[in-house]
Amino acid sequence: GRQGRLRPEVRASLQGLSHFTATPETAKHRFFVRLPVQVAPEHKLIVIPRQDDLVFGILSSRIHCLWAIENGGRLGVGNDPVYNTSLCFETFPFPPGFDLREPQPPNGEPFAAIAAAAADLDRWREQWLNPEGWVEWATTPEEQAAGFPPRPIPRPEHAADWKRRTLTNLYNEKPAGLQLRQERLDRAVALAYGWDDYTPAMTDATILTRLLRDNRQRSAA
């Protein structure tokens, strides 16, 4: 069912939000999604109590995902990266000028560019998952009363194809539309760190070295 139960401390952290950001605990590809608070995440999802485009965008960037892979360890036969809140999220040096303890994201550049790129990525992924003409959107009266958003029901002629439209499959395929939006987001996040020289060709090692330097400088401050 769509009900499920959230741990009380997680439920408390979502007070006043309509959505939260989440990522699978163990996944071959590290991606983040936003889910309505009525949807109780499976226990295998890591919940981050933010709904804004800015935090969703920073976490979805190559920069954060590299940090998470480097710090989170790996698990299982597939040796898949694990996301651990205390190792991957709480240690992450967010861009200067951004304070996670502030409930409202800062306005103006460079943050507006991240939020816009993140919203565009989110929109594009949604359209890929539920293409127009493939699905009808429906809610039962009970779901409506509980505040659930409508959910997609595939049209019979598209049902088999729609079933294959999962985020894991999307990130396996990495179509040009996804790549373009991901690179735009990565660039916007890199600029927030002051890395004007960022390109997709920048090595993972360079990015991690810079993040570690940022982290050390902040710890020393």
Predicted segments with their positions:
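S-adenosyl-L-methionine
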Residues: 1-221
